[in-house]
């Protein structure tokens, strides 16, 4: 038998051995039909922290007002927030957060969602009582508010962005519920122009490096920075 023939026979033998090994490794499994929902980790609907709905959800929504985050200028109430929302327990359970920071949440009574100290330094927004509810809408073009926002978002990132506990950060801050719209037709100070809005968004872009950033609407800065979009939680 010449060398070429011997080589061909050897190759055929090796292929045969290989096929035999693969055949011995094949494992067949039969799955039972299951119509129930199953966990889709960190994707989909996120009930609010503290809600009893969907107790097995591994993603929870946490909304923080500026007033509760920074009650005194430059001092952040992390211990109070951790205790109020039971964040240590959520971490132990492997639950992750969707975080939104807000300045104006319409409610049933007149109230402030920014800190008293910040209101005292600005006070150029609009108190309102509309079909949305009651509250105070800041003038987001105010330079003092802008500078303070840069600092508080940096503090939020320093506290929440290091350990992966917060998976998503919704770019709130502006407008009612942090949704980037204001009922200005009722006489409220309107939303700032795109240049100023982009400055607020840039605060988040510069501060957070681990959490995925989301916007309520596909503004130009969201497109150019490949941000995700979210619907209300």
How would you label these PLM feature ranges?
Residues 1-11:
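Bacterial N-terminal signal peptides that target proteins for export
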Residues 15-30:
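Bacterial Sec-dependent signal peptides at the C-terminal "C-region" and cleavage site
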Residues 28-144, 233:
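N-terminal substrate-binding region of glycoside hydrolase catalytic domains
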Residues 30-52, 56-61, 91-95, 168-175, ...:
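Catalytic-core regions of glycoside hydrolase
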Residues 64-68, 73, 101-105, 164, ...:
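Short, flexible loop/turn elements at secondary-structure junctions
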Residues 86-91, 127-129, 134-170, 196-203:
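An active-site-proximal structural segment forming one wall of the substrate-binding cleft
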Residues 110-112, 180-184:
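Short aromatic-enriched loop/helix-cap "lid" or pocket-rim segments at secondary-structure transitions
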């Amino acid at each position: 038998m010449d060398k070429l023939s011997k080589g061909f026979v050897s190759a055929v033998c090796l292929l045969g051995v290989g096929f035999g090994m693969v055949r011995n490794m094949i494992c067949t499994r039969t799955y039972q039909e299951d119509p129930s929902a199953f966990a889709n980790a960190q994707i989909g609907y996120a009930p609010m922290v503290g809600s009893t709905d969907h107790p097995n959800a591994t993603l929870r929504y946490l909304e923080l007002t500026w007033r509760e985050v920074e009650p005194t200028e430059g001092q952040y109430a992390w211990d109070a927030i951790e205790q109020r929302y039971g964040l240590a327990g959520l971490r132990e359970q492997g639950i992750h957060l969707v975080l939104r920071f807000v300045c104006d949440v319409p409610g049933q009574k007149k109230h402030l969602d920014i800190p008293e100290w910040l209101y005292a330094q600005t006070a150029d927004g609009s108190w309102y009582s509309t079909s949305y509810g009651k509250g105070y809408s800041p003038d987001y073009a105010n330079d003092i508010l802008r500078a303070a926002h840069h600092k508080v978002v940096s503090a939020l990132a320093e506290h929440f962005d290091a350990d992966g506990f917060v998976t998503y950060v919704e770019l709130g801050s502006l407008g009612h519920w942090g949704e980037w719209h204001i009922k200005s037709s009722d006489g409220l100070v309107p939303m700032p122009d795109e240049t100023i809005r982009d400055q607020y968004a840039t605060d988040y872009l510069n501060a957070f490096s681990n959490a995925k950033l989301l916007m309520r609407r596909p503004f130009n800065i969201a497109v150019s920075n490949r941000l995700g979009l979210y619907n209300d939680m």
